[in-house]
Amino acid sequence: MDLKGKTINFLGDSITEGCGVTDIEANRYDNVIKRKCQLKKVNNYGIGGTRIAYQRHPSQKARYDQDFCARSYDMDKSADIIIVYGGINDYLHGDAPIGMFGDKGRETFCGSVYYLMDTICKLYPNAIHVFFTPAHCFCDDGFSLIEEKPENREEHYLYEYTEIIKKTVPLFGFYVFDLSEELKIDPKNEVERNKYAPDGLHFNDDGHNMLADAVIRCLESIKK
């Protein structure tokens, strides 16, 4: 897909907001993509700490509870491409149960993914819809469980959240790209962590430039 002249909405969390980046204008991944691909416009809807699913118990920081589903209503309706990049905070500190495939309400993660995709398709029918699943981070080896999961939430691994997204995508015709495969940064490797994601989760300026390149490759691979 040729990206030149396109308008892209980016719906995401702290990574999309630019946490860890020292020069937002020059190095946050959406702005890098805009510059490299000669986009018409990028609209950044990233809010740190936010989740796809509804939070049953209020967070200490109220902004964390502005979930993706609610915010999906308030984006630029004229955008050519809608990008959703999230899921890590649902795993790290969301209190919604993971639920079952077939859920359609916002009370579970499964249901929220369905609800979000359904809403985006209805509100932005002429746009190309793309979902990026979480990249590698400090806690995604498939064996480690987070130490302080929300009270009364069952134990699950990060890859299970990713698989739910991948399983739901065919119902709505979204394109999906797994950033744990597409982005060659693994913060569990000390060298890569120090170079690209010092806290094990959020990318620095160099990491955002690599993220931008990965997103560009994925978008350009779409046959449109």
Located regions from the model:
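Short alpha-helical interface patches
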Residues: 1, 10, 17, 179-187
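Conserved SGNH/GDSL esterase-like catalytic core that processes O-acyl groups on lipids
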Residues: 2, 7-9, 15-107, 111
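Short hydrophobic segments within beta-strands
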Residues: 11-12, 132
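Alpha-helical cap/lid subdomain in secreted, periplasmic
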Residues: 66-224
